[in-house]
Amino acid sequence: CYMLAGLMLSASSCSSWLSEDDAPVMSYDYYETEAGVNAAITAAYGFLRWGVGGERFDVLTELGTDLFTEGEDGSNRESYNKYATQLNPDDGILYEMWENHYKGISDANIAMQKIRDSQDLLESVKIQSYAEMQFIRAYLYFDLVQQFGRIPLVTEGSFEIRTDFKRAPIADVYNVIISDLRNAAENLPEKASVLGRATRYSAAHLLAKVYLTRGSAVKDARGQKATDMDSTLYYAEQVINSGAYALQENFSSLWDIKNQGNSEAVFAVQFTTEPMFNGDGNKQHLYWLSWYEDQPGMLRDIENGRPYRRHVATKKTMDDLFDRLHDSRFYKSFKWVYYANNVSTLPVWESLSYDGNVYFTPDPSKGQIEGELKFQHGDTAIYYTMQETGLASNSDEMRKLRADYTYSYFPREMHSIRYFPSLVKYLDPSRPSVSEEKGSREWVRMRLGETYLLAAEAAGRKGDFDKAAEYINVIRKRAAWAEGEQKDQQIWLFEGGVNDTKSTYDALKV
């Protein structure tokens, strides 16, 4: 009913002088036509945008984990990062997710019913359109069952208000998801006619993930079967062996805003630069950024982003998760350098004191001339590093060390919930203005890199460790610094490496 309401709303926005006799009448029969089916599919995809249209999926999936923790600002820190008493069933994020996803499921159910009943659609159109709606319904149910467990399972369209929904067993929900996706994987096209539409490989990837999730249960009764790992591997390999996708050669390319829709994206939720059609937009560019505009030589701009400081990488992520010497993904995932963009706040060399004690005096032998600019517009203004100085962050020794640099220097001890290396994954410099929150960057939900990992885990659980290692090494080869590639200078300055262009793959492969 939500699709019809939306179309009726747009139709009712015409000027009041229109004759009622000429007013358009919209009925559900419209969805039995090809134009109506296309409109229904487009509307249904809109529900997939919800997760990044605000502080939503990032809060549900990252806060309170061992990978990211709370930043300096935000209202979800107590409830989702600390699991304090503020986390209640009536929380706004949970309510919004429930409402959005069940609206999408309702639309999909109605559309599927109308597609089945249509006498006007070509059989080929009916089969493909029905499969596409099944993909969307399964996608939404998979989100819900992972978040809430037992949930109402609605598979038929409802044209009347209902309040008698009962929660179904988790196993039943998984059975519907798998049934929907198996049909979608069989009947969707190999290549989408429009960017952002699902393909049989989108369905196969999601199906592999669903089987792996179901089969990984230890105590939960998800309906898991002994064949779940076989099914995971089967569908993951359909994607891998299709030839339809390829890993990006350089990990950095994944985050290049000019490289959207690249060969590695198996399914990505789309947005647009047209405000009228962008809904809430993709707002993830706001939440992973460090404060920078208070530093000398800097002002807030589009390229560096609008820093809401919601999420900061944990100590585990920064210090323990990566083999930083050999794995290029670490240094390619964060922003380490900012370049001066504000001539009015360029700093000069000067004597500095704290609490009455002079801790720094410019040294002319180092080119530090009292009153002269420390750097120019376009030069490095901020530099974050992983250097461990051994100095306390609030000591005169640390203040002296930092003052000796031309730029604002942040060694490891100076990283905080306000100042930290920003995650570059969601940056969106395509926004029309600095203050614009609604970004247009695509939200990649499925990547070939993940497909390889799904296959590797399934193979490992089946005891085929050679195959698991083979798939893992495909990912690790891309993760390594490539032969001929210039490494980040921190590799030899602070990580104990050397300044060379040799591949580090041998150190990473299993």
Regions found by a protein language model. Give the residues of each.
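Short coil/turn linking the two alpha-helices of tandem helical-hairpin repeats
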Residues: D143-Q146, R150-P152, A192, T213-R222, ...
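Conserved, well-structured interaction surfaces
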Residues: E32-V52, D73-F148, R162-N175, D180-L195, ...
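C-terminal motif of bacterial Sec signal peptides marking the signal peptidase cleavage site
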Residues: S10-S13
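An aromatic- and glycine-enriched ligand-binding surface/loop that stacks and positions planar moieties
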Residues: S15-N76, K209-A392
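C-terminal substrate/ligand-recognition segments
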Residues: D91, A340-R478
